[in-house]
Curated annotation (Swiss-Prot):
PROSITE patterns: G_CP. SUPFAM superfamilies: P-loop containing nucleoside triphosphate hydrolases. This is Genetic interactor of prohibitins 3, mitochondrial. Belongs to the TRAFAC class YlqF/YawG GTPase family. GEP3 subfamily. One of its GO terms (molecular function) is GTP binding.
């Protein structure tokens, strides 16, 4: 019926203008119902600029006579409608485009999203307790964790809470896997065995997706019940996932009154005529700035309701990366769409030699990697930014301190603030011994792969000097674990587990004093301290560590690998 009215209106300009006004009134009534910021979910108010939720109320434009029938057609079906301008008479298509209304957002979000200006104090952190208090007992939870940084952001306790039905949902899969089959099939088998053998959790409720490439979105939707809550750390991809699900299954944002009753009507045929503008109004606010979401926001997709919650922060008093890393570098690491997926296929490496003088490799000063003397190594970095070698760490810090402006010839290599570039601002992380390749993960930044080439010979331990406040872990290459483990499991018809069960595959680093010389001895001492309450996890307890690392083992020994879940 409504579709026929649109088509008939094109034959009569007067009717067309009438339909145009109806179309515009829908936007006005929709905006009248919106009492929350479309980006962060906070309640809006336009009375006190110094109070949370302040926004500048837009003034309604005045619509005059349109100049042509083509203008009206374009209005109704345009895929590129623009923002509102205040108090502007509309008499042409160009002016009409400029008056189309956008969802209301608070001034904080507007400045952050459109001007890249924000005060960290306005982006408060939430504990996991703060977030869980917003969820009714017995609810279905999807614990959202970015796959490329796993197991960072993973909270084991969420899968063990008895009064929630929790599934593990791994996002940003395109930053680790080359194809969607790894996410759809292989990862499901691997993580089922990983949870069982590494953590002692029996669960087959794991889904891996890529919201950016729409990989395996159907499995994520299938994992959702009538009411599902997305729970995860800040900036792990919850909003991007919601938007992908809404696009695929035609969802929309829901609003509630003060009594908690839904006041949003289902979209009509008219609403969906301009699908691009429709989704622009409905989408969850996606930002590279952590802690953008401040309140629960609901969405209806098919017959299911999905709730986006503020991201929690494990270390509520942790460092702010904005105080360490330059804004443009930080934006590159946080924006998912800026990740270069070609690196996953080409895997072009850089060779780095270790020497007695302390030759090192860095990406922006975000880390300095110092390989053992006498080794030749390959590194593939998936962290945005150009890498560079220096004679030693002190030389690298000296250069970056001098990079005060873009005029410096090496400015493009510097990603940290010059005032950070003092030795005392960096922490010495030592990697436990390994065979073959490993991946080093920097929390909320990215990961890179390193491999020592040539015949195996232990020549020392790899060191990473990282700014204080950035967490680091080491793992066996995750994509290889998933693919090879899944293959062995399939070939053995399920007799061989898809995940190793007799060795740890993830480990924390060992933070030692800058002057410590007996690294292996100190590592053993720290290993015993870490495992004092987890004695069953201890391995090679009575073996000579030098004897263990001196020979090549058929299976990785992963000496002193340990991660506290």
């Amino acid at each position: 019926m409504l579709k026929e009215q649109f088509l008939n209106a094109f034959d009569h300009p007067s009717r067309c203008l009438f339909m145009t006004l109806r179309f515009r009134r829908w936007f006005s009534t929709t905006l009248a119902r919106l009492i929350n910021c479309n980006s962060c979910g906070i309640k809006l108010q336009n009375e006190n600029p110094k109070t949370i939720g302040y926004y500048i109320k837009p003034k309604k434009p005045t619509v005059n006579k349109l100049q042509s029938l083509e203008d009206v057609k374009y209005l109704l079906f345009s895929q590129d409608l623009q923002h509102v301008k205040e108090q502007q008479d509309v008499g042409s298509l160009e002016e009409l485009n400029e008056t189309m209304e956008s969802p209301l957002i608070c001034k904080r979000c507007n400045d952050a999203l459109h001007r890249n200006q924000y005060d960290l104090k306005e982006f408060g952190r939430y504990t996991i307790t703060d977030v869980l208090e917003k969820i009714p007992r017995g609810s279905n939870i999807l614990h959202v964790v970015p796959l490329p940084e796993f197991p960072f952001h993973f909270e084991k306790s969420l899968l063990e809470v008895p009064h929630f039905n929790t599934s593990l949902l791994l996002t940003k899969g395109d930053q680790l896997a080359n194809d969607k089959n790894t996410l759809q099939r292989r990862s499901l088998v691997f993580f089922k065995d990983f949870l069982k053998y590494q953590l002692g959790i029996i669960s087959n409720k794991t889904v891996a997706v890529s919201g950016l490439k729409n990989w395996n979105i159907q499995s994520a939707y299938a994992a959702m019940n009538a009411n599902s809550y997305l729970v995860g750390d800040a900036n792990v991809g919850k909003s991007t996932l919601i938007n992908s699900v809404m696009q695929r299954y035609l969802g929309y944002k829901i609003h509630t009154d003060r009594k908690g009753q839904i006041v949003t009507n289902e979209p009509s045929v008219k609403d969906l005529k301009n699908i691009k503008h429709f989704f622009k109004n409905q989408f969850a606010g996606v930002s590279h700035i952590p802690n953008m979401t401040r309140n629960l926001q609901g969405y209806r997709v098919g017959d299911k309701f999905i709730y986006d919650l503020p991201g929690f922060t494990t270390n509520i008093n942790g460092a702010y990366y904005e105080d360490i890393i330059q804004k443009d570098w930080l934006e590159r690491t946080r924006k998912t769409e800026k990740f270069n997926t070609k690196k996953l296929k080409k895997q072009r490496y850089i060779s780095v030699k270790g020497n007695e003088k302390g030759n090192c490799y860095t990406v922006g000063g975000i880390f300095f990697w110092q390989p053992p003397a006498g080794t030749v190594n390959q590194v593939v970095s998936y962290i945005p930014g150009e890498g560079r070698e220096f004679a030693d760490i002190n030389r690298g810090l000296e250069v970056f301190r001098a990079c005060q402006d873009d005029a410096h010839p090496l400015a493009k290599f510097c990603g940290v603030h010059p005032q950070i570039c003092q030795r005392e601002n960096y922490v010495r992380h030592v990697i436990p011994p390994f065979q073959g390749s490993i991946e080093v993960v920097l929390k909320d930044i990215g990961y890179f792969t390193i491999k020592t080439t040539g015949r195996y010979q232990f020549k020392g331990l790899h060191e990473f000097w990282v700014p204080r406040g950035i967490d680091v872990l080491v793992r066996e290459p995750l994509e290889s674990l998933i693919s090879e483990g899944s293959w062995r499991h399939t070939e053995s018809k399920g007799r061989v587990p898809a995940c190793p069960k007799d060795r740890p595959i993830v480990s924390s680093t060992y933070i030692v004093d800058p002057e410590e010389s007996d690294l292996l001895g100190k590592m053993k001492e720290m290993y015993l301290e870490r495992t004092s309450n987890d004695i069953s996890s201890r391995r090679f307890l009575y073996d000579d560590p030098l004897e263990v690392v001196s020979k090549l083992h058929e299976e990785r020994p992963n000496l002193y690998w340990y991660y506290r879940w």
